[in-house]
Amino acid sequence: MLNSEAAQSVDEYRSGFYRPEGFFDGLSLPGYGAETPVTREAFAYDFYPARGAEESGSVEESGSAGVGSTEPAPLLIWVHGGAWRFGTNRGLRDVEIMTPEGPRTNRQTLMRRALQEQGWAVATINYRYSHQAIFPGDLHDVKEAVRFFRARAAKFGIDPGRIAIAGGSAGGHMSMMAALAGPDAAGYASGNPELHEYYEGRASSNYPGVSSAVATAVPFYGVSDLRTIFSDRPLAGYSLVHPDDDGAEWRLLGCDYPVREEREWVERVPGIDRERALQNWERVNPLDLARGNFAHRVYAGGSAGEPSRKNFDEKQTEEQATDRACAPIMLVHGIADSCVPYQQSVRVYQALRTRQVPTDMVLVPGAEHGDSRCFSPEIVQRMLSFLNATMNATV
């Protein structure tokens, strides 16, 4: 249990922005008829130092990993959920939150506190919503946040080689993407600079020479295959349509699925052509990356014809997908999840086991999507054990 002094300490944080004011890139959507412009709040962060870091001065000066420690702390970056179109990085601030049923304990905040007590620093980040940037804009934001903290590691008192990532729902999806499509991922080894830039976003980065690699990831009830989520629901005994859907997938990727000729589209993002939508649908799924399958199609843009395929050595890519390490991943999912069925995590777990990537999975009986039971003390402790066991330096 945390005493009052410790509670006050671990709940102190400082906020800032990891991208400059006025940031805009080719993925930002005002040119496509966006609902709201990109504001700097899209790139906000909260930073919570490891417990004890503030006892010997500011966090920049102490670099403490915990009480009595002088070592830089490992950092966990938390990516919030919200169907890629809402949510906030402020969700780990308060221990008590209001719900329609009344006040309840925020177990995600207790998770954050437990991490700090065990010598971890925690950062929570925002990213551009799907009505502010088309995919992979949100992934580029997440990777830029990793670069930001790594580049300023000394100022934050963190170890630049020990950065992990976690998140729930949409944040779980992006956590998996960051872990599986890292800068040294096997799929890049075939010599496809377009694919590398697609996932990395270095061209718009303030820190293009800094790695976006994460050492390990813990996605909670994350989406691993956007193509099958709707078929997974009825197979699991749930309704095809979920109240939280509201076109989350097509808003993120450009059109509905399967990708037909543009004249047949039911839903679409203005200004996104068929080739771009095809590319996004092929490259957005962590399950493919967990299996070592990277979509190497190269699109010219502006045409509804069949995309060309870049020449590459299939055998070489398969070998590299097996031999080159991707970040270890621990998956947490509720068995009663009617929004993102737990099979979405099971398939990733099976794929990683097949490739002999360190992995773990916790399936929570009776837990729905976003259920607080996914953050029980026992699961948080198991998460800490996994993080500490797999935290190999990435730079």
Where are these regions (language model features)?
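Alpha/beta-hydrolase superfamily serine-hydrolase fold, recognizing
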Residues: 1-395
